[in-house]
Amino acid sequence: MSASPLDILQSVFGYASFRGPQQAIVEHVTAGGDALVLMPTGGGKSLCYQIPSLLRQGTGIVVSPLIALMQDQVDALREAGVAAAYLNSSLDAQAQRDVERQLLAGELNLLYVAPERLLTGRFLELLERTEVALFAIDEAHCVSQWGHDFRPEYRELTILHQRFAQVPRIALTATADPRTRDEIVERLALQDAQQFVSSFDRPNIRYAIAQRHNARSQLLTFLDGHRGDAGIVYCLSRRKVDETAAWLSEGGIEALPYHAGLDAATRAANQQRFLREDGIVMVATVAFGMGIDKPDVRFVAHLDLPRSMEGYYQETGRGGRDGLPADAWMVYGLSDVVTMSQMIAQSESGDDRKRVERAKLDFLLSYAEATQCRRELLLAAFGETFPGPCGNCDNCLEPPKTWDATVPAQKALSAVYRSGQRFGSGHVIDILRGIDGERMNQLGHDRLTTFGIGADMDEKQWRSVFRQLLAAGLLATDPEGFGTLRLTTASREVLVGERKIHMREETRPARRASRRRDSQLITGASLGIEAYEQSLWDALRALRSKLAKQHGVPAYVIFHDATLLAMLRAMPENEGDLAEVSGVGEAKLKRYGRDFLDVINAKE
């Protein structure tokens, strides 16, 4: 009797049941149908083509642009007992010939290949001499010329339909709006493709945004809750990446920089350390992340605003891919708004593109200043309605206090108008607070009717008002004027008293714990590990690291954090008990079961 999809899921991958639409997708593709799968990061897309490849006759060919990721994906499959290989430029000629021989001999269940390799005449001829089970086209949004990850070679993959019409194809992506989905189906010539669209929601990620006061101090306070965790800290500039990685390292945190300005060898070495070691913090520009499949990233922090909600979703989505709790944390301030506006204005894009970018920034700003559930707003950006509140974002957990800021807003807008809409927030705040000085006198601004009318509020309070006016679209920065402020069409309603304005109260940042208390923080705290479980948790992770080094694979390839946590809670006494733990398949049980049981039994 042949194996069923559930048999393969349990015996090979060690999971008791499918999640979401996985089973329907697997059955559809196994039966020979084309499919487009839109599933969020961490949703289990890989199983949707891996299991059909094991159930169908022949070899599953996986097309992926992420060369750096292929080896880890193949290592993980081999550890699970699957015959897998990859073909890319990192292999020498002999190794490539060995893989081709295995393919022709029918010895492989799965072969990963880059699109540019697949499209060569030689490789296509090789495939015609091979029994192909299916084609899986990963990161399928790369086909869209409107997307930020456009890869021209993806548009040539129509050839798979032309030359292998009877072989099913499954296109997968974590990010595609309806327009991009239609483009994927058209460009790849998918035939009667069934579309499986999952929710964009990542319920295990906790979203939080704080006003920037002292970014370094705020980041350190945040990291105190992630002692020993792997995470990513995003910065806008290369210089800020280098500086942040340096001072984190000086503070005893294993932090590495990553940006396009580093030489290729350094980037590769830092990426390998991040993937293969526990507890590394990668400080990076957005150049880092595409193709990072590390499941146990416990936090993603932004020290600067991302470019759009899509960018924010994609970057924060690199946390918690194993389904365990992860934090998406960001600080931002008034300067971010000015900087991002200038970047859009000074780019070489056409006017239409700039308008789109500006609208995306406006949406992101309204998200950052929102007082309602963050998850509701985030999913709304992708056309999805969430029946909030979610209970797992800062606004749900600690609803922000608001205040009636109508009068201060009117004063601020009046000061911008009366000073000629030619100055930035710093000078306008000085006008409002009545700060006298030589420049103020030269400009004659000490004689404006708005001079000193805001003296009852300090600079910090006024900066908050201006930041929130910008986020609400009641002020705009002049793209040609180096951050100078101007009124918008919406400003009039406020000025004439037709619209009330409520703003978030400024919150004081939490003070960092003392050094003595810091030393008592435990690793794994972000996963809810208690102090009495600490020694066993550390022992399980130490064993995993040791085995990973011996086998030359990343630690998560041995077992995910989720599997170690399940062991910690189940306390299995024998191999039968361990086989029941989620993530422990037959091959891994045979290879590592005794080692992990010895550690668990020694701690009882």
Question: Model-predicted segments: where are they?
Answer:
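Accessory DNA-binding and partner-docking regions appended to nucleic-acid-acting proteins
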Residues: M1-I8, V356-R358, T385-E604
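Helicase motor core with emphasis on the C-terminal RecA-like subdomain
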Residues: S2-V12, A16-G20, A24-L36, P40-S46, ...
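Short, charged low-complexity linear segments at domain edges
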Residues: D352-E384
